[in-house]
A protein has these predicted regions:
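Hydrophobic, small-residue-rich alpha-helical packing segments that form membrane-like cores
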Residues: 1-2, 41
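Conserved alpha/beta catalytic core and glycan-binding cleft of carbohydrate-active enzymes
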Residues: 30, 35-203
Length: 203
């Protein structure tokens, strides 16, 4: 059913790529154990109706699985990796991040095997549909999901965000300029890094 749906969207609706949220579950067997050579991944890789279609894997799943590096190595899928967390922590000044930042800029060769593979398989981004927007990332130190009835329990607690000295909106010109500079720095790192950049925008 998954394969047939992807082929339909590709051939009838013109979709040219798919991102699999919690993709590691696709590598589990009927008992929930990870195994090499997932039948579904093999079928998707070899289906002629999906030839040339971009496949992107999020390397974790809902029950704690983490398979970073496996989809790219086993079936040639692109992958989310640690780029976003690394850049966020490095830019806000966390200690001990320079080696990880270098690895991220090179395209995570430690994960993908080489800088050439990183150029092909590493999906680099600062923000996504999960968590804070780019503007909130430099405006808040903590999440404030207070208006939806969830009492701030929803959403990520480990955003690695930084408020530049003021929590939330401000008219302070120095704080606003610092926020703009940090956003530009993160965009610079995104664009010069080996891999496939996303289209993070300030909102």
């Amino acid at each position: 059913m998954i394969r047939d749906s992807l082929v339909y969207w590709t051939q009838n609706l013109g979709v040219d790529g798919f991102r699999f949220d919690l993709a590691s579950i696709l590598e589990r067997d009927q008992n929930g154990n990870f195994h090499q050579g997932s039948q579904l991944l093999w079928e998707l890789k070899n289906d002629p109706g999906l030839a040339g279609i971009k496949m992107i894997a999020e390397p974790w799943d809902a029950v704690g699985g983490y398979r970073l590096g496996y989809p790219s190595k086993n079936v040639g899928w692109d992958e989310w990796d640690a780029f976003w967390d690394t850049v966020r922590k490095a830019v806000r000044g966390d200690e001990g991040q320079m080696t990880a930042l270098k690895e991220a800029i090179l395209g995570s060769p430690g994960i993908f095997g080489s800088t050439e593979n990183g150029r092909e398989f590493s999906i680099n981004f600062i923000t996504s549909h999960d968590g804070m927007t780019l503007n909130n990332l430099v405006s808040y130190k903590h999440k404030h999901n207070l208006e939806n009835g969830e009492e701030n329990r929803d959403g990520h607690s480990s955003e690695f965000s930084f408020n530049c000295g003021v929590e939330g909106p401000t008219l302070d010109a120095e704080v606003l300029e610092l926020r703009r500079k940090i956003i530009r720095l993160m965009h610079f790192l995104l664009q010069v890094s080996n891999g496939i950049p996303n289209d993070s925008c300030r909102r």
